[in-house]
Amino acid sequence: MAKVKIQGHASGTGVLTVTAPNTSTDRTITLPDATGTLLNSDGDGSSLTGIETVTKQATAPSSPSEGDQWFNTATSTVSGITTKSMAVYNGTAWKAMSKTGLTATGGTITTSGDYKIHTFTSSGTFAVTVAGTVEYLVIAGGGGGGVANGGGAGGGAGGYRNSTGSETSGGNSSTESTLSLATGNYTVTIGAGGAGNNHGGTSGSKGVQGSSSVFSSITSIGGGYGGGDADKPGGNGGSGGGAARNNTTEGNGTSGQGFNGGDSSGNNDGGGGGGAGASGTNGTTSPYRGGNGGTGLASSITGSSVTRAGGGGGGSESPTDDAGGIGGTGGGGKGGQAGSVGSTPTAGTVNTGSGGGASGDYNTGGSHNGKSGGSGIVIIRYEA
């Protein structure tokens, strides 16, 4: 049986009418602008090879080959491909075949690969001049650490909401849907970190809850305060604050944003604040240690992996060096301890939304104050 091979070049969109050698049926084939072998047909034209097919489904095709095409039917971003859009596999990753078309100003603007990134470390305006779809990372301010004579509690991390590719949001939640933005101005609010409590010379108390960060319809809730002598339970927030000495009521994190704080398990060492990636740990008595802050989460929305939103460490009554809880990865402040050896707690790192470290006692001056949480951040990106 003779084979029909169609070769050549069509400028623009061309139409070839082919009569197979053993049938009177004409086969009409529409060709794009291309050069070389486009497709092969058997003798009667009933079987064609060389035609690219598109897989339409809500998950990325498994075991793809270079050049495979996929249309994302999901209602959210999957493997970095926005909803209702086409992608091609380049041999290592799925890449969007079409751009969002969005253009905007505001914040500090950088580029990474196919993306333009707007980073806001202080409040401002995201001005959209051409409508389109964006991904975002919105982190609130972290909670302040508490003060207690024997172990204040660490502040919780600010709420962590993320729509970047296959990354996660706080509290072990799935990535959120992307945002479709019309032209116009969108206020970006960066939440401040909550203040740590001053010892006051005679009694200690809780820290201050962090402030929320807001972008468009997305609000991340400020981190919960760390408990203190006068107000021992931890505060609720994006991630919860820890409970102060001799108290087991830690603050709760918000679903989809962060984890709970730790408690003091009936001893004189405060619990750690919750982080975006894990709960704060409890204070312990054997040995005497403040609870560690919960770990933060890493995101590559800027093109590089950065961990943010760690919980603050709890304070300890022990004068032993480093008895204060460790701050959670991502910028959580270290907890302090009693006495003068390495006792000073530290603040949450700015623009990470991390919780502040707690004080171990309040009898020896201002260095034993609970420390403030870190301010939040908003990062927005779209295909350039």
Question: Predicted regions span which residues?
Answer:
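Extracellular/surface-exposed low-complexity repeats and stalk/linker segments enriched in Gly/Pro
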Residues: 2-4, 49-80, 97-98
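Short, ordered beta-strand-loop transition motifs
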Residues: 10-11, 21-25, 65-66, 109-116, ...
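Short hydrophobic/aromatic-rich beta-strand motifs
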Residues: 28-30, 61-88, 116-121, 137, ...
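Repeat-associated, polar segments at repeat-unit boundaries in modular proteins
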Residues: 35-38, 88-96
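Low-complexity, glycine/proline-biased repetitive segments and flexible coils/loops
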Residues: 90-93, 99-384
